[in-house]
């Protein structure tokens, strides 16, 4: 369906056309008419499907710009998502004259208060900062007509449930509420029951939770071999833009440093970075000044960056929903992408949990060899030399070196000179700088009937799952080769001893339901 068939005003349609959009995405096509009718909506769709426009366009349509009041509130999980949503809402509402402000932690609250006083029709913010402003009476909610919860599952995972409930309780009851989430855990459903009026459900089928445009692979690799395995794959694939996910802030810092040592243009983002640096890194990544962005799950929430071709899960995510969000960074706007997850041998059971959620089976991928990496880097160097020789600006400087060049040509053969140039351009695989990445414990192995080991049907933790993988691998190119033989008693005994020596606190209900055990820093 085209946007001009959705009963939107001429002002909005003009801005939509300027942005180059013609066809509405499925979530937009189904949500916009319901929202324009004033109905509450719960929308479930993967990231990158146009959720901001799905709630933003009908919200902008209802704004009365002649009234200097805050009429809509958008709650977002992270600073980055708040800024991006504010920018998109401002872009679409520009012709209509809608004022949109964003508020978030890590920036001066005084400046944000001043901006709110200067006028706003829509406010986009993170839960903590919104509550601060409400308590200071700098954010007045009495005229709110539309409340939007964006990436609701992420706000839940980040522990914002109480803050969200506190904010909702202060918004007028006769409001319209729009809730969007990539996944729909029970706590999110309870919000719908408690705070929404007969909401309409718009849902992307589970089989589409991860887009078909993303080829999903995994590599079974030991912890100490992950970094070299990943960088060789990058050498071979030569991704235009890649995001690498690490589980901790320390991991992000170490990976960023290591990638720079190996010659990649890389920067990292995590919660400890100040806001100015985070925005600078993201701007450089969007503009192509960086090849690789390294991030924690929290720091990457809601990133809307076009052109990401590869996602590397250096650490397997701690919950399956995070996997959906991670790979949603690629395969956007009709373009294909690739995700590669590195899995320690005793983390194999976690893949089935992810697959149960995404309804898509990951393919085993064979690691690239040292020689394949070296050959790829040489090809890149040769192409760069060819491009430079075709550049008239570069060739104009050649004559400055004419006398010295002729002297070298008299002493050495063209082949020797070419080999020397390549040796300066391409890192020798035998002399690559060493990179140390601190080892972290793999996710805890937890045998059960849900794919974490034992004898779960089709589970990856048991022998049958591996045998199926071996059969799938044959004839399918670069697939992972599994060791043959028993994975039974010896492994079970080791896991039994591991569990005995690493007793965990009692599991919460959500941990029992998902199978994932998340502990605070310092817990064994």
Curated annotation (Swiss-Prot):
Q: How does it sit in the membrane?
A: Peripheral membrane protein
Q: Name one GO molecular function term.
A: ATP hydrolysis activity
- What is one cellular component GO term in this UniProt entry? cytosol
What is catalysed by this protein?
Answer: ATP + H2O = ADP + phosphate + H(+)
Basic and acidic residues: compositionally biased ranges: 463-498
Q: Where does ATP bind?
A: 45-52
Compartments, as annotated in UniProt: Cytoplasm; Cell membrane
Q: Which Gene3D superfamilies match?
A: P-loop containing nucleotide triphosphate hydrolases
Q: Does the keyword Ligase apply?
A: no
Q: List the disulfide bonds.
A: none
SUPFAM superfamilies found in the cross-reference section: P-loop containing nucleoside triphosphate hydrolases
Q: How does it assemble?
A: Oligomerizes, may be a member of the RNA degradosome.
> What protein name does the entry list?
DEAD-box ATP-dependent RNA helicase CshA
Signal peptide: which range, if any?
A: none
Residues passing through the membrane, by range: none
Q: Which gene is the coding source of this polypeptide chain?
A: cshA
The Helicase C-terminal domain extends over 213-373
Summarizing the function annotation, the protein's role is: DEAD-box RNA helicase possibly involved in RNA degradation. Unwinds dsRNA in both 5'- and 3'-directions, has RNA-dependent ATPase activity.
Lineage, broadest ranks = Bacteria, Bacillati, Bacillota, Bacilli, Lactobacillales
> Where does the motif Q motif lie?
1-29
Which Enzyme Commission number(s) are listed?
Answer: 3.6.4.13
Taxonomic source organism: Streptococcus pneumoniae (strain ATCC BAA-255 / R6)
Top-level taxon of origin: Bacteria
Report the residue ranges where the short sequence motif DEAD box is annotated in this entry: 150-153
Where in this protein does the record put region Disordered? 440-524
């Amino acid at each position: 369906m085209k946007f001009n068939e959705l009963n939107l005003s001429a002002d909005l349609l003009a801005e939509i056309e300027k942005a180059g959009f013609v066809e509405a995405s499925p979530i937009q096509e189904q949500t916009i008419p319901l929202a324009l009718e004033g109905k509450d909506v719960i929308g479930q769709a993967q990231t990158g499907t146009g959720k901001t426009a799905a709630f933003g366009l009908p919200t902008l349509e209802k704004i009365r710009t002649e009234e200097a009041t805050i009429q809509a509130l958008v709650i977002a999980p992270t600073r980055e998502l708040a800024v991006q949503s504010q920018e998109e809402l401002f872009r679409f509402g520009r012709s209509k004259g809608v004022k949109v402000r964003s508020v978030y932690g890590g920036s001066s609250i005084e400046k944000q208060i001043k901006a709110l006083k200067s006028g706003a029709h829509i406010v986009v913010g993170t839960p903590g900062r919104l509550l601060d402003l409400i308590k200071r009476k700098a954010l007045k909610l009495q005229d709110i007509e539309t409340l939007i919860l964006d990436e609701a599952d992420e706000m839940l995972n980040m522990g914002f449930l109480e803050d969200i409930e506190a904010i909702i309780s202060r918004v007028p009851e006769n409001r319209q509420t729009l809730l969007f989430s990539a996944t729909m855990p029970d706590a999110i459903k309870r919000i719908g029951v408690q705070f929404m009026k007969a909401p309409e459900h718009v849902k992307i089928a589970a089989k589409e939770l991860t887009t078909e445009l993303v080829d999903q692979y995994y590599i079974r690799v030991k912890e100490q071999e992950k970094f070299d395995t990943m960088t060789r794959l990058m050498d071979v694939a030569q991704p235009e833009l890649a995001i690498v996910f690490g589980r901790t802030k320390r991991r992000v810092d170490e990976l960023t440093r290591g990638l720079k040592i190996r010659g990649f243009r890389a920067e990292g983002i995590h919660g400890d970075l100040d806001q100015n640096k985070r925005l600078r890194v993201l701007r450089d990544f969007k503009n192509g000044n960086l090849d690789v962005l390294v991030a924690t799950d929290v720091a990457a929430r809601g990133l809307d960056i076009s052109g990401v071709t590869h996602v590397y899960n250096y650490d397997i995510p701690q919950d399956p929903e995070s996997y959906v969000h991670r790979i949603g960074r690629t395969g956007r706007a009709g373009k294909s992408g690739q995700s590669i997850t590195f899995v320690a041998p005793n983390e194999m059971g976690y893949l089935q949990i992810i697959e149960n959620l995404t309804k898509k089976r990951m393919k085993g991928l064979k690691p690239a060899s040292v020689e394949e990496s070296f050959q790829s880097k040489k090809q890149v160097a040769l192409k760069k030399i060819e491009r430079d020789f075709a550049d008239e600006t570069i060739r104009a400087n050649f004559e400055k070196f004419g006398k010295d060049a002729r002297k070298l040509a008299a002493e050495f053969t063209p082949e020797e000179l070419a080999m020397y140039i390549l040796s300066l351009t391409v890192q020798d695989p035998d002399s690559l700088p060493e990179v140390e990445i601190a080892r972290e414990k793999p996710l805890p192995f937890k045998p059960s009937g849900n794919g974490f080991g034992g004898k779960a049907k089709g589970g990856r933790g048991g022998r049958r799952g591996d045998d199926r993988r071996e059969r799938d691998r044959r004839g399918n190119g670069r697939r992972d080769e599994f060791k043959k033989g028993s994975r039974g008693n010896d492994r079970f005994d080791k896991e039994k001893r591991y569990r005995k020596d690493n007793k965990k606190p009692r599991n919460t209900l959500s941990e029992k339901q998902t199978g994932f055990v998340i502990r605070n820093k310092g817990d064994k």
